[in-house]
Amino acid sequence: QDAAKGEAVFKQCMTCHRADKNMVGPALGGVVGRKAGTAAGFTYSPLNHNSGEAGLVWTQENIIAYLPDPNAYLKKFLTDKGQADKATGSTKMTFKLANDQQRKDVAAYLATLK
């Protein structure tokens, strides 16, 4: 995992995200270690909020697994927690990052943001 390369890949994410302020997507400073759906001042989709309520905390590993298909990841998380009834709707995040190495690099970069 290479945070410097991840910073370059993150430029694609800046259409919707910044480290220090909410935009279309939530601020990502401090995302690693934060409960899903809890960035201050951001209104999340029920799917994302429910995932946080069910115990999803963002780790580098979770971010790597989330990025290829955010909706599928959150729905599987809730279903695995026995909360399939709350695994409805969709997240606001439509971008998907398919490349495995880029996902690892972005997760490493996000871990540096405070």
From Swiss-Prot:
PROSITE patterns: CYTC. Heme c binds at C13, C16, H17, M93. InterPro entries: Cyt_c-like_dom (IPR009056), Cyt_c-like_dom_sf (IPR036909), Cyt_c_1A/1B (IPR002327). It comes from the Bacteria. One of its GO terms (molecular function) is heme binding. Keywords: Electron transport, Heme, Iron, Metal-binding, Photosynthesis, Pyrrolidone carboxylic acid, Transport. The modification Pyrrolidone carboxylic acid is found at Q1. Binds 1 heme c group covalently per subunit. Gene3D superfamilies: Cytochrome c-like domain (1.10.760.10). GO terms for biological process: photosynthesis. SUPFAM superfamilies: Cytochrome c. Belongs to the cytochrome c family. Cytochrome c2 is found mainly in purple, non-sulfur, photosynthetic bacteria where it functions as the electron donor to the oxidized bacteriochlorophyll in the photophosphorylation pathway. However, it may also have a role in the respiratory chain and is found in some non-photosynthetic bacteria. PANTHER family: CYTOCHROME C. This is Cytochrome c2.
